[in-house]
């Protein structure tokens, strides 16, 4: 069976080139015998999993946890369900140094900072997590963090920001999981529907959509909108926040 190590928030357009500001979230239950990713991973049944641009569903055989995810522009909405009624826990893992701060009984701020291939100074990313159930405890294990939750089912709202922790909280999804999934599906259908394909065989449309999906998969929106509706962005050349829009791309020729 294939291995499931968690949901990875990534900025890597291809395995051939490096990643930056990545974060791995691994849902588990109970005590873990070691403090590395090897001890947290689980097998899953590929035939029962769903991998769509707007929706992911995967079932962890080891922990009997169903994980569902739908993306947003700055994050995602996640549904976790432990089918035996055991309390959920969530591990947070990254290559960068992580700092966690509990904002209230259901909200966590994460800050990570690390060097990239092009930046002269470390790039900081802020992540906000809100849970539909209360947080029982937070503890550091090695360089990682474990979040214990008071329930076997939880909806997790996630958002990131390269500006501030306050902006990350503002970027959190405002809708429930079902509405987030509906909006994500509509967004992808709009992007993939920009072109008409004259098909000469059954695989033409599928292959074209696959290539177009990969083109749009890399995050290109690098600006964020504050409470006043004003756009700003992290200027990577100076390491300062500047007003206005900024778009990126991966610059990858393959």
Description of each model-found segment:
Residues 1-254:
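Accessory carbohydrate-recognition regions in carbohydrate-active enzymes
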């Amino acid at each position: 069976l294939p291995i499931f190590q968690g949901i990875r928030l990534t900025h890597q357009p291809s395995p051939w080139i490096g990643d930056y500001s990545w974060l791995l979230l691994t849902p588990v239950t109970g005590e873990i015998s070691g403090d590395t990713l090897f001890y947290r991973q689980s097998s899953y049944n590929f035939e029962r999993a769903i991998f769509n641009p707007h929706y992911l569903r995967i079932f962890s055989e080891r922990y009997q946890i169903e994980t569902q995810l739908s993306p947003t522009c700055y994050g995602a909405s996640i549904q976790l369900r432990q089918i035996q009624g055991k309390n959920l826990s969530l591990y947070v893992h990254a290559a960068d140094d992580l700092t966690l701060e509990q904002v209230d009984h259901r909200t966590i701020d994460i800050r990570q900072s690390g060097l990239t291939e092009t930046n002269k100074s470390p790039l900081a990313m802020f992540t906000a997590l809100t849970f539909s159930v209360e947080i029982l405890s937070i503890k550091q294990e090695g360089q990682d963090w474990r979040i214990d939750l008071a329930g076997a089912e939880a909806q997790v709202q996630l958002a990131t920001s390269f500006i501030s922790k306050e902006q990350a909280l503002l970027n959190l999804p405002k809708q429930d999981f079902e509405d987030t999934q509906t909006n994500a599906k509509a967004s992808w259908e709009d992007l993939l529907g920009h072109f008409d394909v004259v098909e000469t065989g059954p695989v033409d449309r599928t292959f074209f959509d696959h290539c177009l999906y990969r083109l749009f998969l890399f995050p290109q929106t690098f600006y964020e909108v504050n409470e006043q509706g004003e756009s700003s962005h992290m200027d990577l050349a100076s390491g300062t926040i500047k007003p206005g829009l900024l778009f990126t791309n991966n610059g990858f020729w393959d």
